[in-house]
């Protein structure tokens, strides 16, 4: 497990990883800029107060609300966009570290997009549900545990599906659920660290590619 983590950390600084991270960040920032522009246009069209300061107050309030939303949603949105490129990351890891193993098959584009959207929705809903607990003593632990389960399930199965059908990937993950969950605690902790959380999708892909190879070898 530690070996997988250190290997993934080394992969994280490769040019291919940086390229995917910059693409995902660029798409995320472009999306929020577009939302901000559209919101300002809608406010300008539908809010007309008798006092100019009231219009300005609404504009500033909306801008601040969107800014807060940007920082809160940046990580899951970046993860969703990064999900579109994760196959090439997994392929690069396999080529670099496991050239003697059978190559994985990239997921169909439609399937990859659907998985990214589903993962974004689930992570967002779970994090919103757990967020109020953060203000209590156990909140942070619950948040990390919830994210560990989600990250372990999603990334392990995604990597495994490059080599086997979904049903087999899911069964392999369940058979090794303690290992997968404990391994996922590291990227789950990264999700609560600002800016470091942006690297979670790429790190997790490399990390669980190494873990999958380890589990597969021990099961052989």
Task: Give the positions of each predicted feature.
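Membrane-interface segments at transmembrane-helix boundaries
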Residues: 2-5, 76-113, 154-174, 211-220
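Internal, well-ordered alpha-helical scaffold/interface segments
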Residues: 91, 95, 111, 115, ...
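Long, highly hydrophobic alpha-helical transmembrane signal-anchor segments
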Residues: 26-68, 104-125
């Amino acid at each position: 497990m530690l070996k997988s983590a250190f290997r993934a950390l080394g992969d994280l600084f490769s040019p291919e990883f940086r390229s995917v991270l910059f693409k995902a960040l660029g798409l995320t920032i472009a999306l929020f800029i577009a939302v901000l522009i559209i919101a300002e246009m809608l406010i300008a069209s539908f809010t007309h107060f008798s006092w100019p300061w009231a219009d300005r107050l609404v504009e500033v309030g909306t801008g601040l609300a969107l800014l807060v939303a940007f920082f809160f949603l940046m990580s899951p949105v970046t993860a969703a966009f990064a999900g579109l490129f994760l196959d090439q990351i997994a392929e690069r890891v396999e080529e670099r570290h496991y050239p003697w193993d059978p190559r994985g098959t990239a997921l169909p584009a439609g399937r990859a997009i659907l998985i990214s959207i589903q993962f974004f929705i689930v992570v967002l809903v779970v994090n919103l549900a757990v967020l109020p607990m953060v203000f209590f003593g156990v909140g942070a632990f619950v948040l990390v545990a919830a994210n560990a389960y989600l990250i372990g399930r999603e990334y392990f199965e995604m990597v495994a599906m490059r080599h086997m059908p979904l049903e087999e990937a899911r069964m392999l993950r369940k058979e090794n659920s303690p290992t997968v969950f404990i391994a996922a605690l590291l990227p789950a902790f990264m999700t609560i660290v600002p800016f470091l959380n942006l690297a979670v999708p790429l790190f997790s892909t490399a990390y669980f590619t190494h873990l999958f190879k380890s589990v597969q070898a021990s099961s052989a």
